[in-house]
Amino acid sequence: MDYDEKRERLAERLRQELNLSRKVYEAIRKVPRHLFVPESYKNEAYVDTPLPIGYGQTISAPHMVAIMCELLDLREGDKVLEVGTGCGYHAAVTAEIVGKSGKVISIEYIPELAERARAILKALGYDNVEVIVGDGSKGYEKEAPYDKIYVTAAAPDIPKPLIEQLKPRGRMVIPVGDSVQWLIIVEKDESGNVRKKNWGSVRFVPLRGEYGFKSVRYD
């Protein structure tokens, strides 16, 4: 079975299991996950599981990428902040949904991962994704405010700068916690009031940075 067929099967299974919207299904169906994972894991690229990408980091399981995209209610033209580029796969899926009129600003703490992701995204033609090396726990004020924000690593609490950089009527999805983690949906109304909702239990690598966990080691 070739990669295209494996990707089709994965997308169809997720569509049925998660009742995916057409836009999220099409994005998962289109983005070549095998090009984002290390060579030694290419054969497992379309298994619905996280995979190591080096530096103590992982590429999220496809079902979690799909769930986060659905929870964000991504729309064409959205400006999105991604905290934690990793290998760039999640950014590519998001970019497919927001389209050429949208934009994804992705912040990565580890320069080597950022460089690799930037090269893959560029080669695949994702001109609407900008990868920046920096402390994503502080957001990226230069491009704020954002329609949507999502974080791909677990924070001790919701970083204040991310709430501040979210547009009124915007939405954020972020895992919070240490040994026990919860996926939190944050919504900001037109007056700037914030409402939080707990989606459920998840498992992510820890967020590093000023508003992240201080004692994180990368091998």
Curated annotation (Swiss-Prot):
Q: Which reaction does it catalyse?
A: [protein]-L-isoaspartate + S-adenosyl-L-methionine = [protein]-L-isoaspartate alpha-methyl ester + S-adenosyl-L-homocysteine
Q: Top-level EC class, please?
A: transferase
Enumerate the Pfam families for this protein. PCMT
Localization: Cytoplasm
Q: Which GO terms describe its biological process?
A: methylation; protein modification process; protein repair
List the GO terms this entry assigns under cellular component, sorted alphabetically.
cytoplasm
Q: Which NCBIfam families match?
A: pimt (TIGR00080), PRK00312.1 (NF001453), PRK13942.1 (NF010549)
Free-text function comment from the UniProt entry: Catalyzes the methyl esterification of L-isoaspartyl residues in peptides and proteins that result from spontaneous decomposition of normal L-aspartyl and L-asparaginyl residues. It plays a role in the repair and/or degradation of damaged proteins.
Record's protein name = Protein-L-isoaspartate O-methyltransferase 2
